[in-house]
């Protein structure tokens, strides 16, 4: 036996461990032959010695396997970090340029108070308020700059599934929806008093979003909801009436995202599809159906205009489109993939990297990145200028499934707001400090703030 790489003592230990292993596995003839070959008499390998070395070989073997796995994991992690380093923007530029900013670990704040998994988060369009909803039936309002809980809102009788800030110009409201089949409206300027409850859906209400007042004559009074009853409904929040019902999905409608001009709505469903609706017409029908996912489609996002050049290049279009508020979209699924689509319903790219269900998506307001969260506990950043390559992974974003992600809306003076879409914010008259001043000349000021929520009961704030 070649033992050149072992010391004499190590070789003797190995020989005895092998003999003990052979003896324990009823291979006594083989063990005896090895003892003879190694000149180890019975007196040298007595029962006490055999007992001492019993199981040692197996322990050494499993230790080697564990070490090999750890080395492979570390090599993979090192490769990921090297890739991130090679493709990263210098830190000095990231700190100065919000367009290049990406979240990093650790989070600025971890917000703890919910007693059950967190399902949703939403930023106030101007102030440093964040709403979070949970399976504990409550909504909590936080000051995300200070990391402090401001109040707990009770009213729903089952899990809160989504929240959103928005509403009429100069009168920002908070909307929430629940497994109790209702949508509730709360007034932030009046201690979050419940001012209206909207019944009408026949099953759990999965998602709710205010529709921007970008279209001609838009008032900001419209709200869209998605439900397990397979429908989407559009509501007038000033009256509480359902003004349109959208039918087309064959299963539970999971998520909904309005376009910045309020004309289009993107929805996703358990029927494995996404659908784009033109809600400016009296009886909306799906304008485009996104077919390709192999499982339930849980989340969606509409790309901002700043992303058009990168997505157009990915789609092989020489000149980026500039006419529509919806030229490109993203969807995330239980099939663990993210798909990028054009307005015709053509899948232009499949982003692979998550190891579990993709739960939430948000485009960077600067247009270069798409961010995603998933049940693999991670937050991932995909670079649209590099064919959608994953350039950053926050592996410890949470200690359990990450269920939601929102980006604080950018701020522009005197322009209506919509939450989470890189849209514009305005004051609702609440006597609080704004979280950053409006940009000069009406230009949007990107707020480098992201919130995520998880089954680990934590809301996390990633901020510059």
From Swiss-Prot:
The keyword Cytoplasm applies. It holds the Pfam family LisH_PAC1. Residues 78-93 have a biased composition (Polar residues). Residues 62-89 form a coiled coil. One of its GO terms (biological process) is establishment of mitotic spindle orientation. Belongs to the WD repeat LIS1/nudF family. Positively regulates the activity of the minus-end directed microtubule motor protein dynein. May enhance dynein-mediated microtubule sliding by targeting dynein to the microtubule plus end. Required for nuclear migration during vegetative growth as well as development. Required for retrograde early endosome (EE) transport from the hyphal tip. Required for localization of dynein to the mitotic spindle poles. Recruits additional proteins to the dynein complex at SPBs. This is Nuclear distribution protein PAC1-1. It comes from Podospora anserina (strain S / ATCC MYA-4624 / DSM 980 / FGSC 10383) (Pleurage anserina).
